[in-house]
C-alpha cells in the first residue's frame, strides 16, 4: 500500500525561532520556513527528504530519540558538537566513554552512538555503524 511512498517524520518544539537557528546555524542543515503555515519548518535532508518541525505551545520533549544522524566519524562529530557548546546526554544505564559515546562496536553490541538535545529538549543522536 505504501511502497514507494515518500514518508517523513515530524516533531514539535516550543520555540520555532530557536529551532530554526539550532538546526540551521548550529547543525548546518538546510532549514526552510513554510511561509503558508506559520510555525512550521522543513529540514531538507539527503535525497530530497524532509523532516517537519512544528511549534506547539504546550510542547513536551519526546522521551525517545526523534532524529538519528548517521556519520562516518563519530569522534570528529562529537568534538565539533562539543566545540559548539552542545552537551552530550549521559545515561546511567549505558557504558559511555569520557566523550559521552556508547562504543557499541567494540563490545559487539551495535553501533557507536552519542545523544544530545535540541533547545526544546528533543533527543537527537549521531550514530556510526
Enumerate the predicted regions with their spans:
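Short acidic/glycine-enriched loop/turn segments that link adjacent beta-strands
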Residues: 36-40, 61, 108-110
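Core segments of cupin and vicinal oxygen chelate
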Residues: 4, 10-50
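Short, charged/polar surface micro-motifs in flexible loops or helix N-caps
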Residues: 47-50, 59-61, 74-76
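Helix N-cap motif at beta-to-alpha junctions
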Residues: 15-16, 71-75
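Vicinal oxygen chelate
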Residues: 1-2, 69, 78-129
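Short amphipathic alpha-helices within nucleic acid-binding modules
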Residues: 22, 75-80
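Short hydrophobic/aromatic beta-strand element in the GNAT-like acyltransferase core
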Residues: 42, 50, 68, 113-114
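N-terminal beta-strand motif that seeds the catalytic metal site of vicinal oxygen chelate
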Residues: 1-18, 64-67, 127-129
Amino acid at each position: 500500500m505504501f511502497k514507494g511512498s515518500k514518508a517523513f517524520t515530524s516533531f514539535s518544539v516550543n520555540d520555532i525561532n530557536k529551532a530554526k537557528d539550532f538546526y540551521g546555524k548550529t547543525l548546518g542543515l538546510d532549514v526552510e520556513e513554510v511561509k503558508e503555515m506559520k510555525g512550521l519548518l522543513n529540514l531538507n535532508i539527503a535525497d530530497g527528504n524532509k523532516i517537519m518541525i512544528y511549534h506547539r505551545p504546550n510542547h513536551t520533549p519526546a522521551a525517545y530519540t526523534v532524529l538519528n544522524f548517521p556519520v562516518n566519524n563519530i569522534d570528529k562529530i562529537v568534538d565539533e558538537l562539543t566545540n559548539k557548546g552542545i552537551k552530550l546526554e549521559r545515561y546511567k544505564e549505558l557504558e559511555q566513554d569520557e566523550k559521552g559515546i556508547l562504543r557499541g562496536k567494540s563490545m559487539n553490541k551495535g553501533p557507536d552512538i552519542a545523544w544530545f538535545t535540541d533547545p526544546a529538549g528533543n533527543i537527537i543522536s549521531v550514530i556510526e555503524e
